[in-house]
A protein has these predicted regions:
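Redox-cofactor-proximal catalytic regions of oxidoreductases
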Residues: 60-144
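N-terminal Rossmann-like FAD-binding beta1-loop-alpha1 element of flavoenzymes
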Residues: 16-41
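Glycine-rich loop(s) and the adjacent beta-strand/alpha-helix scaffold that form part
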Residues: 34, 38, 45-56, 208, ...
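Glycine-rich phosphate/pyrophosphate-binding beta-alpha loops
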Residues: 94, 506-518
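Extreme N-terminal leader/targeting segments of oxidoreductases
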Residues: 1-16, 34-35, 534-566
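A glycine-rich dinucleotide-binding beta-alpha-beta segment and adjacent secondary-structure elements
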Residues: 13, 72, 199-202, 240, ...
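Conserved redox-cofactor binding core of oxidoreductases
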Residues: 120-232, 467-470
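FAD cofactor-binding and catalytic pocket of flavoenzymes
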Residues: 79, 98, 104, 118, ...
Length: 566
């Protein structure tokens, strides 16, 4: 005789379990905690203190996230068939390693891609952009450097000088570099801070406490409101528990034996593991028949922000382009394109191994042949590409982004180098514009900088040898849509076909933005969480002790920046 099913309430570890602690996960953690929910955040990476970051990226165990090689740093590198992806790892996600740049896209970005119909997304997100700016401490960069002056000259040559601007960034600036400033953002309720020293170390991990990483704002207050953060915890699967909740299976991410497997039970789940992490997890769960009702659009409409990364490297050591913040300025050569110069700090030369001599576009067959020809015709410069010494000081990196639509698909398949199991890879969908591995304006910018600095122009080696672009801003794969046929989630970030399952990270974005996407991810996360009801309507919001105000008020330097360089 079958025993009757128990009607007792199952024991839950939390109301909401959040997978990932980047921009989407951190916003979700704070706003759900404010609404009275018990929140648990699981993060595969480590928790970092300011003094723990590597002094240079030659300390690869602290810089790169390659657990198989016992490297547990903040920078992931993922090579797929169609793109090389740079992303972040650690409590705070991409904010630990990103270039601080927080920009609102051009209006046209909201009119392309697969944004859900029936909503004016520019208008809908406008108040959430303002909230995100306050929380992330967005201010204009107050100082330009030599690379920025060269970029301004390039903009002037194109007749686009009027579009050149210092970037809006999430950094604490002050009248004196390295000055202790208490908490200038949240009325003393936030962590103590130190002003920027312009060392250029934003993308290696800020060792001064000037960078407004998520552990200093959203996550800081989420934890003050009771949210729990468990670092070094990798989510391996999710499934319904049969009683209206969710089972989340995990293991320790930094162990190779005794992996500490554990299953958590939650009433709701927010997936915020970044585009690669979230899409891979959902594809794996569908493959294992744990989530069989997922949209067929899962894995599709993946975009790279149509990015190209190139630059120029001086032939002499008697220069220093590493001073400043990671990205200090940019301009629009046309309404669809944005160009920035990027820098690494002095001594952080390990990324030089991703560079080689610049060549123009072609196919996967012809472009390597062009590269070989360039190497033969410029043998000394070719040999210089193998010398990492003082690379960060000698190099000016160019980052170009476009909001023009192009996409590919993420899939799980057996790969030629490891046929024993399935892993994440990519393929192109018929009828979709391929992602660009070459943009003429990018090469034009690199050559201009090279001429002005006595340098040789350079490109990412994967772009010229494999015809595969590099992106630090992979988007989509679980993107918004009007129906399950054209999206994985609805306009409120709810996964089609499931209750209390959300996606809130870069994978939700349904189009190329053409600018650095962190501010948009934050604003869209604010929008998503604003739709979630209070846990107890009678209790109301658990407000922060003080409302976030305009970042750095009273200590921001004057805005008249352009006059310094014009």
């Amino acid at each position: 005789m079958a025993e009757p099913k128990s009607t007792a309430e199952p024991s839950y570890d939390c109301d909401f379990l959040i997978v990932g602690s980047g921009f989407g996960g951190s916003v979700s953690a704070l706003r759900l905690s404010e609404k009275g929910y018990d929140v648990l955040v699981l993060e595969a990476g480590k928790r970092w203190r300011t003094e723990d970051f590597p002094k240079t990226n030659w300390n690869v165990r602290k810089f790169l996230w390659l657990p198989a090689l016992f490297c547990y740093g903040i920078q992931r590198l993922t090579l797929l068939r169609d793109v090389l992806v740079l992303s972040g790892a650690g409590v705070g996600g991409g904010s630990l390693v990103y270039a601080n740049t927080l920009l609102v896209p051009q209006d046209e970005a909201f009119n392309r891609g697969t944004w859900p119909r029936g909503t004016d997304w520019k208008q809908a997100l406008a108040p959430h952009y303002e909230t995100a700016k306050r929380m992330l401490g967005v201010v204009p960069n107050p100082h330009l450097w030599e690379g920025d002056r060269i970029l301004l000259e390039f903009a002037r040559n194109l007749g686009k000088e009027d579009t050149f601007r210092p970037t809006n960034v999430g950094v604490l600036f002050g009248e004196r570099p390295g000055q202790s400033a208490g908490d200038p953002f949240f009325g003393g309720e936030g962590p103590e801070r130190t002003t920027c020293t312009y060392c250029g170390g934003c993308m290696v991990g800020c060792r001064h406490g000037a960078k407004n990483t998520l552990d200093k704002n959203y996550l800081w207050f989420a934890e003050k409101l009771g949210a729990k953060v468990r670092p070094e915890t990798l989510v391996t699967g999710i499934e319904e528990d049969g009683q209206g909740g969710w089972l989340v299976h995990t293991r320790r991410s930094t162990r190779h034996v005794f992996r500490g497997r554990r299953t958590f039970r939650a009433r709701g789940v927010v997936l915020a593991a970044g585009a690669l992490g979230t899409v891979n997890l959902l594809l794996k769960c569908r493959e294992q028949r744990r989530l069989t009702r997922l949209s067929p659009a899962l894995g599709g409409y993946v975009r790279t922000n149509s990015e190209i990364i190139c630059g120029a490297t001086a032939r002499t050591d008697e220069v220093d382009y590493s001073r400043g913040i990671a990205i200090a300025s940019g301009f629009h050569p046309d309404p669809d394109t944005y160009v920035e110069v990027v820098r690494y700090p002095k001594g952080s030369d390990v990324m030089s191994f991703l560079g080689t001599l610049l060549v123009d576009g072609g196919t996967r067959l012809t472009r390597p042949l062009k590269w070989l020809g360039t190497c033969l015709s410029h043998p000394l410069d070719f040999l210089r590409t193998f010398n990492p010494r003082h690379w960060a000081q000698r190099s000016t990196i160019v980052l170009v982004m476009q909001n023009l639509d192009s996409a590919f698909r993420l899939v799980r398949a057996r790969r030629w180098f490891w046929p024993f199991g399935r892993g994440l890879t990519s393929r192109r969908d018929p009828g979709q514009a391929p992602i660009p591995a070459y943009l003429p304006i990018a090469n034009q910018a690199a050559r201009h900088i090279a001429r002005q600095t006595g340098a040789f122009p350079s490109s990412s080696i994967n772009e010229v040898v494999l015809n595969v672009p590099t992106t630090a801003h992979i988007l989509g794969g679980a993107s918004m849509g009007t129906t399950p046929e054209d999206g994985v989630i609805d306009a409120r970030n709810r996964v089609f076909g499931y209750e209390n399952l959300y996606v809130v990270d870069g994978s939700m974005i349904p189009g190329n933005l053409g600018v650095n996407p962190s501010l948009t991810i934050t604003a869209m996360a604010e929008h998503a969480m604003s739709q979630v009801p209070l846990k107890d309507q009678r209790a109301g919001l658990r407000h922060l002790p003080v409302q976030a105000r305009a970042a750095g008020a009273g200590i921001v330097l004057p805005d008249a920046v352009l006059e310094q360089v014009l």
